């Protein structure tokens, strides 16, 4: 199996990796503090419906909690949206994040590629 997802900093000397959604500056001190303050929660299986998280995001963004979707990452959300929409035909920019193509192929969508040109600083 070919490893197609980005973030392989173990085999590739990468300074800034734009193929994954990670913070190039590392974890913030606020996140480290929140983890330390809630370490006892880490042994509890998380709420699959993300009720508290969705409510907190909804309150902060002033929207209804029903308008907030949570996932374990971009790839999971991409696959979920593609499964919900089930597009028969899709226009996909290339090059792009590999999970778009994988998700579309998983539902049998006919993919039409629009290739960006490097000479135009895609």
Q: Can you annotate each of these PLM segments?
A:
Residues 50-90:
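Phosphate-binding glycine-rich loop
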Residues 1-44:
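N-terminal "arm"/small-domain region of PLP-dependent enzymes with the aminotransferase-like
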Residues 18, 45, 71, 114:
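Hydrophobic residues at beta-strand termini and immediately following loops
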Residues 21-24, 74-75, 97:
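Short glycine-rich anion-binding loops that position phosphate/pyrophosphate groups of nucleotides
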Residues 83-122:
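PLP-dependent aminotransferase-like
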Residues 1-4, 72-73, 117-122:
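Short gly/ser/thr-rich secondary-structure transition/capping motifs
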Residues 15, 28-32, 50-54, 78, ...:
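A general structural signal for well-ordered alpha-helical segments in protein cores
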